[in-house]
Regions:
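Short, small-residue-enriched loops and turns at beta-alpha junctions
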Residues: 24-29, 76-82, 106-112, 136-141, ...
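General beta-strand structural signal in soluble alpha/beta enzymes
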Residues: 19, 50-53, 71, 101-102, ...
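C-terminal alpha-helical cap/extension of soluble enzyme domains
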Residues: 2-36, 79, 167-239
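Short, surface-exposed connector motifs at secondary-structure boundaries
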Residues: 40-46, 100, 121-126, 177-181, ...
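Conserved N-terminal beta1-alpha1 strand-loop-helix module at the mouth
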Residues: 1-94, 129, 137-145, 227
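A short, hydrophobic/aromatic-rich structural module that often spans a beta strand
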Residues: 62-76, 114-128, 138, 145-157, ...
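Alpha-helix-loop-beta-strand connector modules within alpha/beta enzyme cores
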Residues: 14, 55-87, 94-95, 111-135, ...
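Glycine-rich phosphate-binding active-site loops on the catalytic face of alpha/beta enzymes
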Residues: 22-25, 44, 73, 95-109, ...
Length: 239
């Protein structure tokens, strides 16, 4: 299978920011309407792409933004849970995804189909595939079966590499040096300096999620810092 690396939808992301608009189950913002509003807001702020999960979220976001939409489905939290089946991938395309993000590892999938089957089905539906990888081996495997681009999304989460404090720049550089398709940096990009470091390491585009779209985590960072500072400055707190 041949990757479609010259596709205009993928080309629109080159050197640009992609924002992951996702909320965790049970959180106040876990609503397609809210995620669609977040997507609109970050596009107004300059995002050139949106990454979103869940069919209803994709359906809500698609009519409201005209940038590249990377779609996925999450099922569970162990093993292959990012767009784990061929049917899930096709549902993402039907919901409006330009690029479908899938697990790019060699692990068994719940429908028993190989990654190649998912990629072939997505290509037949005129969409592209982003393979979320945790190692160079994952990326090379995904590309061999037709992935159009690869991401560092799973770095530190498959057992192949330790979890890095920030973005896994070492893996990013390794992928850039050894693969023939665009490499998208994703995972633990916490500030603009991290994002720029990813571009400087050769990333085709950079995905930022929690640092932009997760107010609970952002607020906790501020609250914890203030609480820590207050304890240090309070003489009573040192006794």
């Amino acid at each position: 299978m041949i990757a479609r690396t010259d596709d205009s939808r993928l080309a629109s992301l080159k050197g640009r920011l992609v924002v992951s608009c996702q909320a965790y189950p049970g959180e106040p913002m876990r609503s397609p309407t809210i995620m669609a509003a977040v997507a609109q807001a970050v596009v107004e702020g300059g995002a050139q792409g949106i990454r979103a999960q869940g069919i209803e979220d994709l359906k809500a976001i698609r009519p409201l933004v005209d940038v590249c939409l990377i779609g996925l489905v999450k099922r569970g939290s162990d093993g292959v849970f990012i767009t784990p089946t061929v049917a899930d991938a096709l549902d993402c395309v039907t919901a409006g995804a330009d690029i479908v993000a899938v697990d790019g590892t060699r692990r068994d999938r719940p429908d028993g189909q190989p990654l190649a089957a998912t990629i072939a089905a997505v290509h037949a539906a005129d969409a592209l595939v982003m393979a979320d990888c945790g190692s160079l081996d994952d990326a090379l495997y995904s590309i061999s079966v037709g992935a159009d681009c690869v991401g560092t999304t799973l770095a530190g989460y498959t057992g192949a590499r330790p979890v890095s404090r920030g973005p896994d720049l070492e893996l990013l550089a390794e992928l850039v040096a050894h693969v023939s398709v665009p490499v998208i940096a994703e995972g633990r990009v916490r500030n603009p300096d991290d994002a720029l470091a990813c571009l400087n390491a050769g990333a085709y585009a950079v995905v930022v999620g929690t640092a932009i779209t997760h107010p609970t985590r952002i607020a906790r960072t501020f609250a914890d810092q203030l609480a820590h500072g207050a304890r240090r400055s309070d003489p009573e707190g040192s006794r």
